[in-house]
Swiss-Prot record:
Protein name as annotated: Uncharacterized N-acetyltransferase SAV_5428
Single biological process term from Gene Ontology: aminoglycoside antibiotic catabolic process
EC number: 2.3.1.-
Superkingdom assignment: Bacteria
Family: Belongs to the acetyltransferase Eis family.
Length: 409
C-alpha cells in the first residue's frame, strides 16, 4: 500500500471530516455542530493520510495551553479527530500519523501532547499515560440531602438563556483555570462548544438550561444542564442531566448543587465528568446513593521531557535522576536530573547514577500530580535504584488539587 501523509488543506476538510465521522459509526452530526468543528479545526496543525484520492486517516492538534502544578499555563498539543478507515486498519496508518504528529509538535516547541481516547488501550505504545480521571455520579436525590456551608442562602440564583450569559460564565471559568492542573484555557470560539445544543445531544431531555449564581451583583458561579422527564404510577421520576458546573467559592458551589438536587418533578441527578476531589462529595448525607464511577480522562505525553518537567513546580524539594525509556521519541531517552521545589525547577541531561527508571508513558501519567509514582512502582512500572528516591519523587510530584479535564475535545 502506498499512502501519503500530508497537512490538511481547507478545501479537503469536508472529505477529511467525513472520513472521521464514518470511522466513529457514520451517524451525521447536526449542521451547527459540524460547522463549529470546522471553525475550530486548525488545518495547518492537522494531517490526513491519502490513498490516491481517498482519505483513509485523520488527526488534528489543537493549540492548547494547559495548567500544570504550580499554576503555569503550558503549551500543549490537543490531539483530536484521530481515525483510520476500516478498509486500511492494521497497515501502519495510525503509527504514521503519530510519528508525524510528535515530530511536528517537537518542531513547534510544545513540550506536551494531550488527548482523550475512544479506546484507552491504543495510545500507551506511543508514550501517552493516563494523567487525569473523572467521576460520574448517578444520585438518588429523593434519598440524599446536602448539608450546605454558611453563606449559601446569600447566593442569588437565576435562570438565563445559555448564549446570553456566555461571557460571564467564561469569565468564571477563566478564573478557575490556574488553580487546577489539567484545565485548558479556552481560546476564542471554544466557548460556543459549551452551549451547542442540537437535538441529537439531548437524548430525550430538554434543551440546555442555565442558572447563574450571583452575590452583590457579581457572577460567582453557573451550571448548565438538561431535564429528562419521566413518570411512573407512583409519581414523577425525572432526571437532571448535568453538563457543567463551576463556582468561585464554597457557598456558590453549594447553592448550585442544592438547586440541582431540588428541581421539581425529578428524583435523580446524573453528573458526568466531575473532578475526583469535588467538594459536593463532602456535603451529601449518603455517599453510597451517589453511585460513583471513575474512569480515565486526559492522556498525557511528554514530548520534551526536560522542558515539561521544568514547566511545573513541585510540592516538596526534589533532586532525582530519572532514566527515561522512550523508544518512539528517542530524543527523550536517557538520564535526566530534576532539581526543583515550589518555586521552580531545572531538568538537564546527566551522567550521574540513576535513582528511578521508568517509561515516558508513566512519567506522563504522574506529570499532573494525580497518579502516584509509588503506586506505579507497586505495579512494577517504576524501578527504584536509590532507596528513598521513590517516596521523595512521589511527594514532590503530588498535587493538592486533583487534576481534571472539564470537557472533551
Amino acid at each position: 500500500m502506498t499512502t501519503d501523509v500530508r497537512v490538511l488543506r481547507q478545501d479537503d476538510w469536508n472529505l477529511w471530516y467525513d472520513t472521521l465521522i464514518r470511522a466513529f459509526g457514520g451517524v451525521a452530526e447536526a449542521s451547527e455542530e459540524r460547522e463549529l468543528w470546522q471553525t475550530l479545526t486548525e488545518c495547518d496543525r492537522s494531517i490526513g493520510v491519502w490513498d490516491g484520492d481517498a482519505c483513509v486517516g485523520t488527526a488534528g492538534a489543537f493549540s492548547f495551553r494547559v495548567t500544570v502544578p504550580g499554576g503555569a499555563s503550558v503549551p500543549a498539543a490537543g490531539i483530536t479527530m484521530v481515525s483510520v478507515a476500516a478498509t486500511h486498519r492494521r497497515r501502519g496508518v495510525l503509527t504514521a500519523m503519530m510519528r508525524r504528529q510528535l515530530d511536528d509538535i517537537r518542531s513547534w516547541g510544545e513540550p506536551l501532547a494531550v488527548l482523550t481516547a475512544s479506546e484507552p488501550a491504543i495510545y500507551g505504545r506511543f508514550g501517552y499515560g493516563i494523567g487525569t480521571h473523572q467521576l460520574t455520579a448517578d444520585v438518588d436525590t429523593s434519598r440524599v440531602r446536602l448539608s450546605v456551608p454558611p453563606g449559601t442562602d446569600d447566593v442569588r440564583l437565576r435562570y438565563a438563556v445559555p448564549a446570553d450569559v456566555l461571557d460571564v460564565c467564561e469569565a468564571v471559568y477563566a478564573r478557575l483555570v490556574p488553580g487546577r492542573p489539567g484545565m485548558p484555557a479556552r481560546r476564542p470560539g471554544w466557548d460556543r462548544l459549551m452551549v451547542l445544543d442540537p437535538e441529537s445531544r439531548r437524548d430525550g431531555a430538554s434543551p440546555l438550561q442555565c442558572v447563574v449564581a450571583e452575590r452583590d451583583g457579581e457572577t460567582v458561579g453557573y451550571t448548565r444542564f438538561r431535564v429528562k422527564p419521566d413518570w411512573e404510577p407512583s409519581g414523577p421520576k425525572g432526571t437532571v442531566v448535568l453538563q457543567d458546573l463551576e463556582a468561585l467559592d464554597p457557598a456558590a458551589h453549594a447553592a448550585l448543587w442544592r438547586f440541582l438536587f431540588d428541581i421539581d418533578l425529578t428524583s435523580h441527578l446524573n453528573a458526568r465528568n466531575r473532578p475526583l476531589d469535588e467538594a459536593w462529595l463532602h456535603l451529601v448525607s449518603d455517599i453510597r446513593r451517589c453511585n460513583l464511577r471513575k474512569r480515565d480522562s486526559l492522556h498525557v505525553r511528554l514530548v520534551d521531557v526536560g522542558a515539561a518537567l521544568e514547566a511545573r513546580t513541585y510540592q516538596a524539594p526534589v533532586d532525582v535522576v530519572f532514566e527515561v525509556e522512550d523508544a518512539f521519541c528517542p530524543w527523550n531517552e536517557g538520564r535526566w536530573r530534576l532539581t526543583g521545589d515550589g518555586k521552580g525547577a531545572t531538568c538537564v541531561r546527566t551522567r550521574d547514577s540513576v535513582d528511578l527508571a521508568l517509561s515516558v508513558r508513566d512519567l506522563g501519567a504522574a506529570y499532573l500530580g494525580g497518579v502516584s509514582l509509588v503506586s506505579l512502582g507497586a505495579a512494577g512500572r517504576v524501578r527504584e535504584l536509590r532507596p528513598g528516591a521513590l517516596t521523595e519523587a512521589t511527594s514532590a510530584f503530588s498535587s493538592a488539587i486533583a487534576p481534571w479535564l472539564p470537557h472533551g475535545f
